[in-house]
Curated annotation (Swiss-Prot):
Keywords: Carbohydrate metabolism, Hydrolase, Magnesium, Metal-binding. InterPro entries: Glyco_hydro/deAcase_b/a-brl, YdjC-like. It comes from Homo sapiens. GO terms for biological process: carbohydrate metabolic process. This is Carbohydrate deacetylase. It comes from the Eukaryota.
Length: 323
């Protein structure tokens, strides 16, 4: 059998958000379309999700959450720079704005991250296979440093670096979505240093900013992976991660992280991703392109002709995305 051109981890985010979401994620995993999940420990269905992960031996990491719902750490007991007046996190953009303004106390971020890592260990009986950030909070300035420190302290080696080659030229993305994707990429580039200094590792490439929700299709996923493979030497195998959000739509009031489910979770877009990921079209295209699905644990040892995921392999993917 010829060596694959790419070994791809397909990660389903937001595991534990609601039972219907989790049902779809498990369905995708059992179909071989998803190879890893990221668990929200403050999600409405966290405990049942952890049971599903154990039952089906699903590789599970932490989806560190600093932007949606209620905290699990000391912040839940009183005033915190992480929370609004109602005791909830500040929201996707609210948290970013607070970080940019210098209003977020980074030691409080560290406390919450450690609490979530501890909660994960209690739920699963082990450390996460990896940790990434809900709404990419883990690469924000300052936050990336304490995130890396916490992961190193808890023995977590793998993270996500959300740098997607060519995302700035993806004209199908609405202007706000494209601007957000490019902002995430700028933060991710700056996070390389802190992540490397604390021994964190990640796949050579990342895809998912351009293929989220309604924008996912077999053609776009394979196109994004093709951009990653451009210029790859013959006989060399790259590693990559595809971020995905499959599942069945949430039905209010069930779901969420303490505030109920958000609009995206209740929309048809989650089901759309599930159908794209599990359809024969995408699987056939990936096989034709020499892409082999795997879990992060499968990348833990170097094979002939490929690199162990780490910072030095990233250099070809660090060029800026153009708006």
């Amino acid at each position: 059998m010829s060596r694959p051109r790419m070994r791809l981890v397909v990660t389903a985010d937001d595991f534990g958000y609601c039972p219907r979401r989790d049902e779809g994620i498990v369905e995708a995993f059992l179909a071989g379309a998803v190879t890893s999940v990221s668990l929200l420990v403050n999600g409405a269905a966290t405990e049942s999700a952890a049971e599903l992960a154990r039952r089906h031996s699903i590789p599970t990491g932490l989806h560190a959450n600093l932007s949606e719902g209620r905290p699990v750490g000391p912040a839940r007991r009183g005033a915190s720079s992480l929370l609004g007046p109602e005791g909830f996190f500040l929201g996707k953009m609210g948290f970013r704005e607070a970080v940019a303004a210098g209003d977020v106390d980074l030691p409080q971020v560290r406390e919450e991250l450690e609490a979530q890592l501890s909660c994960f260990r209690e739920l699963l009986g082990r450390a996460p296979t990896h940790a990434d950030g809900h709404q990419h909070v883990h690469v924000l300035p300052g936050v990336c440093q304490v995130f890396a420190e916490a992961l190193q302290a808890y023995g977590v080696r793998f993270t996500r670096l959300p740098l997607e080659r060519g995302v700035g030229g993806c004209t199908w993305l609405e202007a706000p979505a494209r601007a957000f994707a490019c902002a995430v990429e700028r933060d991710a580039r700056a996070a390389v240093g802190p992540f490397s200094r604390h021994g964190l590792r990640w796949t050579d490439a990342f895809v998912g900013l351009s293929t989220c929700g309604r924008h996912m299709s077999a053609h776009r996923v394979s196109g994004a992976l093709a951009r990653v493979l451009e210029g790859t030497l013959a006989g060399h195998t790259l590693t990559a991660e595809l971020m995905a959000h499959p599942g069945y739509p949430s039905v209010p009031p069930t779901g969420g992280c303490g505030e109920g489910p958000d609009a995206f979770s209740c929309s048809w877009e989650r089901l759309h991703e599930l159908r794209v990921l599990t359809a024969p079209t995408l699987r056939a295209q990936l096989a034709q392109d020499g892409v082999q699905l795997c879990a992060l644990d499968d990348l833990d040892s170097k094979r002939p002709g490929e690199e162990v995921p780490c910072e030095p392999t990233l250099e070809p993917f660090l060029e800026p995305s153009l708006l």
